[in-house]
Each structure stands twice: as C-alpha cells, then as structure tokens.
Amino acid sequence: MMKKGKGKNSGLLPNSFKIISSCLKTVSANATNVASSVRSAGASVAASISAAEDDKDQVTWAGFGILELGQHVTRHVLLLGYQNGFQVFDVEDASNFNELVSKRGGPVSFLQMQPLPARSGDHEGFWNSHPLLLVVAGDETNGTGLGHSFSQNGSLARDGSSDSKAGDAINYPTTVRFYSLRSHSYVYVLRFRSSVCMIRCSSRVVAVGLANQIYCVDALTLENKFSVLTYPVPQPVRQGTTRVNVGYGPMAVGPRWLAYASKSSMTMKTGRLSPQTFTSSPSLSPSSSSGGSSFMARYAMESSKQLANGLINLGDMGYKTLSKYCQDMLPDGSTSPASPNAIWKVGGVSGSDAENAGMVAVKDLVSGALVSQFKAHTSPISALCFDPSGTLLVTASVCGNNINVFQIMPSRSHNAPGDLSYEWESSHVHLFKLHRGITSAIVQDICFSQQSQWVAIISSKGTCHIFVLNSSGSDAAFQPCEGEEPTRLPASSLPWWFTQSLSSNQQSLSPPTAVALSVVSRIKYSSFGWLNTVSNATTAATGKVFVPSGAVAAVFHKSVTHDLQLNSRTNALEHILVYTPSGHVVQHELLPSVCTESPENGLRVQKTSHVQVQEDDLRVKVEPIQWWDVCRRSDWLETEERLPKSITEKQYDLETVSNHLTSHEDACLSLDMNSHFSEDKYLKSCSEKPPERSHCYLSNFEVKVTSGMLPVWQNSKISFHVMDSPRDSSSTGGEFEIEKVPAHELEIKQKKLLPVFDHFHSTKATLEDRFSMKCYHTSATGSHQVNGKICQDIINCHSKPGSIESAESSEEGSTKQMENLHDSDHMSNSIKSSLPLYPTVNGIYKEIEKNNANGWMEKPVTAKLSTLKETRITNGFTTPPILTDSVNEQMLSTGKPPMGFGFALHEEHCKAVADPKEEHLKKKLDEVTNVHHLNVNNNNTEKLQGDKMVHGMVSFVGD
C-alpha cells in the first residue's frame, strides 16, 4: 500500500507543477496590466519626490560614532561623507540636534572618530588637538605639510613622495587626514600609495586597512608602530540598493586586540597549526540533519526548474522570490540565485592562499603576540566587529547569509618559560550563528547594544536585521505576560554568555555547540520611502507624513525628547537610531510582540497571524517614534561649531595634574553636560595631604542691592565636601554605600572685608576743599550755581542685613543710586568708626544755622529714620539724598554705631564741626578716605570737590 501510494504521489507531483505553470501563465498576462499601472503610478510619485531630492548633496558614506570630550563624557554623533565634503551631527539629545561641522571639499569615502588616546609618560602628542575626526579622501595639494607617507612595502617615506597621480585622488582615496574639532583645521596627514579601504580606532592605536596590509600607528603620537599582511580585501563589483558605503571591512579593533583576515595559517613553535574543521550548521534548526537538508534542497531546486516556463513571464523578481524558499535549506557557501561572485571581486590570491579564505587572526596590541587564529567561514571575510567589551567578535563572509559570533578567550601556553604565546586552538569559542537571509548581500554596518545583548546587521539592500543574543535560543525574552513587562536577561557580575564549560580550568573539554539564531525583527527599505503600501494609503488619506524607511547605519541609542519620553512605552526593550537612504535619522523603539487573548475565539493574535510572523519575523516590533531630515543641501553654508574651551582645556589640565600626583594625592573630576552643548559645570577638588592642604579654594562674589535673609550656604557653620568616585570592586554592580565613599572638604579662604572706593576724577585738595560742596539753585528762569560750604555732614552706617533707603530727596534734583555689595557673615566687624553723630534725644539731628559767604541762610536737611521720600529746603537749595539704614532709633540717641555693622561714607554729607575735636575728625577721615577727591563738572563753569565712598564691600578670596 505504501509503495502504491508513493508511486501515485510521484506521478502527481509533475502534473501538479504543469497545472501550476499554466495557471501562472494566465495570471502573468493579467499581472502585466497591473504592473504597468503600478509602474506609471510609481513614476508619477518618483517625479514628485525627485524635485525635493535634487538639491541634496550626494552621500558617499554614513555612520555613527562617539565623540569623547572627557574620560566619562561622550556624545553620539552622525558622520556623513559627501562627494563634496563631510558633515558631523550631534545626535545625543533629540531636542538639540546640532550640526557641529559642515565642510565642503573633495569626495570623502570614510569617516571615523578617534577616541581620547591613552597617555604615557610626558608625551603630549596631539592631545591638545582632540577631539579628532579621521577623514579618508583623495590626496590634495592644499593639505597641511605635517604628515607621513607610506610606501607599498611598509617603509615610512617622506611627506610628498607619494606616486599617486592627481587624477587618482577621486577614484582611489589614499590620504587619511586628522581634522581637529577644536581648532577646525587639519593637524596631521597620512598618505599611502594604495587605496585606503577602512579605518578603526581605539585609545591605543589607529589602524588603517589597505587592500593587502594593515598599518597601526600610535594613537597619541601618530607614529608608525607595526604592520601586518592580510588576506586581500574583497572589493564590491557594484554598490547595493542604497548606494552608500562599500562594505564594513574585514578588520576590527578592540580595547586590547586587533582582528583581521589572515592571509595564511601561522605556525607554532611546537609544529604546524592544524585549523579546526569548520562545519556549517543547517539553517533550519540545530536538530536537523545536514544530509537530509541537502537532499531536500537539491530536490526543491530540481522541482523549481519545472516552473521556469511559468515564472519567466513574471520576471527576475518572481524567480528570486521562489528560489528564496529553496535556498533556505542550503548550507553556507552553496550556490544561490545571486552568487557572491557577482557582488565581490577578490584579486591577488594564489592557489595556496585561496585555501585560507575565511581565516581570522587576533593580535595583541600591547605585546604583539598572536592571541588566536581560526577559520570562521569557508568564503573570504568581508566584515569583522568587536562588541564594546572587546571579547565578542562578529564575522561575516562575502556571502552574507550567515553571521558568526565568537568569544575570544586567550589561553597561555607553557612550552617555554618566559615566552609569551597562546594556545590558538582553544582561545576562541563559537557561540552563535545568526541567519540573515538566503540571498547574498554586502554587510555594510554592524552595531552592538551597550550590554552586548542586541546586535544589528545592515545589508547593502537597506535592511536592518536585528538579533538578540540569547544563549537559550528561545523567545522567552520577548513574550510578556498580560499586565507584566517582558522578561529580560538578568544582570550578573560575570558576562551573560559565561558558563562553567568556558572556565579556564575546564578548557580541555569540548566547547559548546553554537546556537542558531534567526532575525527577531527587520527595518526594511522601500524604494519610495514608505514602510508598506497599506500604511501609505492610510497616511495619504489622513494627510499624515510618511515615515522614511530602510537603514544605512545604526546605533543603539535612546535620543528622545522629554515630551515623547513621557509618552514612551514602559515595556520598550531597546531603542535604535537609524540613518536611512533618504537622508533622515529615525528613532525606533523595540517592543515585544502583542499577545492579547480574544474572548470570542480564545486565540492569541500571534497564533492567528502565524504566516505573517513567519514572513516578517515580528517577534519584536520596531516602531518609529520621530525622525529628522539631516541630509545637507547644496545651498547650506559651511559650519564650524567650536567646542567649549572650558571642556577641552580643563580636561587637559586635569589629566596633566593627575599624571604628576602621587598615589596619595588624587584628583576627582566631575564634568556634567546638559542638553545645551555650550554649557558645562566643572568642579575640581584635591584631597588633603597631612599636614599640608592643597591650595584649592572655593570663592564667591555677590552683588546685592536689597536686603534679605542670608542664604544657607553663607552661614559660617556650612561647609562643602566633595566625594571621590568609588573605585572599589564592590561598586561594579552600580550600587554602593555612600557612607564608605571618602569625602574631602573644600577650604573657604576669607580675608577682611574692605570698602570699595569710587574714584572717578580724583584730585588733591586741602581739608577745607574736601568739605566744600556745590549746591544747585532751581528757579523759573533756569539754574545757576552758588558756591558755599555745607556746615553739616551726616555719617551713614550700614548693616549687612539692613537695606539702604533714601530718606530725603528733591523734586527737581536727580537722585543717586547706590549699590550695596555683600559677602559672608564675617564681614560685619571689618570696619568700625568712632566719629560722633551728634544726635538729639528725640532722634533728630541738630539743625545748625550759619551764614555762608554769599549771605544766604542755609538750613541743613533733617534726617529722620522714616519712610520719607523727599525733603525740601525753604531757601530754595537742594542737596543729594541721604541714605540711611533701617536700624532702630536707639543708635541715633546713643551716638554709637551698633557692634557688628560695617559702614561706608559719603563725604558730601559729612559734617565739619568747628569744635575741639576737629583735629581728631581730620585724622580719622584721612585714615578712612585715603585722601580721595571727587570732581564733578557742571556746564563746565565750576567744580564740585569732595570725597565719595561708594557703599559696598568685597571679599578677596583665594590666592
């Protein structure tokens, strides 16, 4: 029975293909009319969009980087290379997207931000020029004369000895220029005789990758350190859909290691290295057998040939669509509809070197020893990338179907004492195999999340493939229960991928089998920029703006404004920032799939849409939140946003001080950047060293014109302390006990408070001249001046908390404003006076009548402690206002100022009394006023002489 049934099925299958073929011919005839309608509609839409796209500059390279302003101060930036220059955007804060640099010039093929270099010794190098941007462009004659040139054999040549022609500058970029974002100028140039394919930077080295060689220069001095020969870099024959970037490149630089595509397998001292046999796992699941999958793949390919006649009318797209499902069962490196040979070109490879295709070598940047070497793929390597920790290495081949993730675990060999070597075979573990797709594509960008749990792979087709590195391979992390947040990976002091089998004492055991992971979500590219056709029709009907689609470069970063952050989903798994082919930066939010039960059918949404989930991999939803159009227009001006000098200079000063401090003398830096890029808060403190104290003081100068309560920090019992950053190993988890953090007090150094003098025009005069004052007479016909001597003067006393009010003024005359400068509560005892006030018992000053030289009778002003705003003189003369303090009237009755109050003098109100104490009064005034005089010209006719002391006091703090 089974044989008979099997025979029937074998005969039914070809007949079914014939029926399907005839049906497809009928459908294709009708599809031709539909396709023509779609093409005409697309052409009209493209024509409407092209008008707005014509003024945009052509982008040649795009990527995200990190701008380091200090040891713990970083900002995410977007780097854009154009046919006519480059552009740098600050994308750290969504509310303040800022264009830092926009330069026009020649074509740029690569951009990279250089981290702050690690300083060693007294070498300053180019530290003063940081932050530095590395620009790969053609060799130009207008560059700076400072730089080096590298010959083909790796020797260092003189600057200007490059044989590259002027015409090769556009097609073959051979120059690396170091652009300072601080001075906005090129400070250094590296010239090579072959094209520069890629650049990677760390705090130790700057690695420049050429077609067959890698040069590593010191990150601080930019001097050549070493070079290595590599497998020829595959050159793309044609660009991808986005026509931006040419591939990520087979080179990776971590905090300690350099990974590159090795040209040949190295030999150890114990013998020839035996490479580990690489067997690619099937694409379906780890439990599937490779033999069965290959048989099914061949059978499916033979069956697809029977459909060729029916599919030929549907065009090349239909064939690729059907072949896509057949290729899903093929192992890595098998023939695919789009062969990698049609995308990549690898030149300069001999027969022996071709066997080493896919070999990866890891080199120690400090010792220069080879840490590990293994065969990652059967095809040439096209992309290498380290995670933020520098221990996970992502590898991709020219096929681009599968991406492997390895963990680098150095294992020392003990063959020779004192010899630094590693066991290459046991220094790596294959952790994950990420399946991107079945068609070949160029991997042009790779990015990790901060905790290395998420990884995004961007292909040249404009699609961003998002994976989650889950060691179990299940989807438990994305299926939230109702009313609960999604389960996330637990935090641990050890790496999340660390297991007991990976410990150093068990490395003799076989490594675990690599876990096959599939895409959890995709950000797809549409040729018209829309996310999908249905949503576009909806947005067009509602009048909403379409969302830019696709991806060229990405970074896991949350750049959301405060308003949108309040409305953000609480169950968001991660945020990713993407640069699209249309020139937009889009902020996406990663959300878990919706799993709600329907009361009618009792089924979950995910189960009812199983076909859609299988097609689109919607285990994690990617929703755009906001986007910005950042592509430069042809009419935009160049921009040079200068970084705050306080940031770079203070950072340099702190680094200089910390390098010269002993272990006991430590410096603590706290640099806080707010959303506005030009503002910063800077606090510097030094620890105490018994019995000395570092000369670092906290000073304050405050101008106060009204009275009020003292601030809390002005109290003498208040002190300031600075806590050092915790460096204990127990604080690695993010929490620490604040009581155990060492704190150091900031010294507030004070000096005696001194009065501030307002000199204006000072002249020397006699004592009588200092007490002479000009009076102004106002009449209906005009103003005339009368000289005379004022026979009464009043001394003003000022208390720190009290206010200065004008007790008397004139309706016709103008009043003078006085300022009261205050400091800490220690200034009260700075100045005291023994000058008599001559008050009466009822609190009113004595009125002394005296005939002046002109026969006028002057009646001096009476100053009461009241709220009078003006005082009139009966004889028609006015005097400047007298400023008094709101102290109690007992001060006037006793004739002595209260203790603890400072004062200042206005000598135009000082009273010269002809009594036996006149000589004592002259002596005291000379000591206080220092013989300063005030000259005021009025209508250039006469002069007003007298001393003036401005109300106020200032504290001189620090040394």
UniProtKB/Swiss-Prot annotation:
GO cellular component: phagophore assembly site membrane; vacuolar membrane
Keyword Cytoplasm: no
Tissue and organ expression note: Expressed in leaves.
Subcellular localization(s) per the UniProt record: Preautophagosomal structure membrane; Vacuole membrane
Topology versus the membrane: Peripheral membrane protein
InterPro entries, per the entry: BCAS3-like (IPR045142), BCAS3_dom (IPR022175), BCAS3_WD40 (IPR048382), WD40/YVTN_repeat-like_dom_sf (IPR015943), WD40_repeat_dom_sf (IPR036322), WD40_rpt (IPR001680)
Region (Disordered) residue spans: 802-832
Keywords from the UniProt entry: Autophagy, Membrane, Protein transport, Repeat, Transport, Vacuole, WD repeat
Main location (coarse class): membrane
Keyword Nucleus belongs to the record: no
Induction: By sucrose and nitrogen starvation.
Quaternary organization: Component of the PI(3,5)P2 regulatory complex at least composed of ATG18, SAC/FIG4, FAB1 and VAC14.
Function comment: The PI(3,5)P2 regulatory complex regulates both the synthesis and turnover of phosphatidylinositol 3,5-bisphosphate (PtdIns(3,5)P2). Required for autophagy.
UniProt comment concerning the protein's domains: The first protein part may form a beta-propeller domain involved in specific binding to phosphatidylinositol 3,5-bisphosphate (PIP2), leading to the association of the protein to the membrane.
Family indicated by similarity: Belongs to the WD repeat PROPPIN family.
Name of the protein: Autophagy-related protein 18g
Organism from which the protein derives: Arabidopsis thaliana (Mouse-ear cress)
Highest classification ranks of the organism: Eukaryota, Viridiplantae, Streptophyta, Embryophyta, Tracheophyta
Gene field: ATG18G
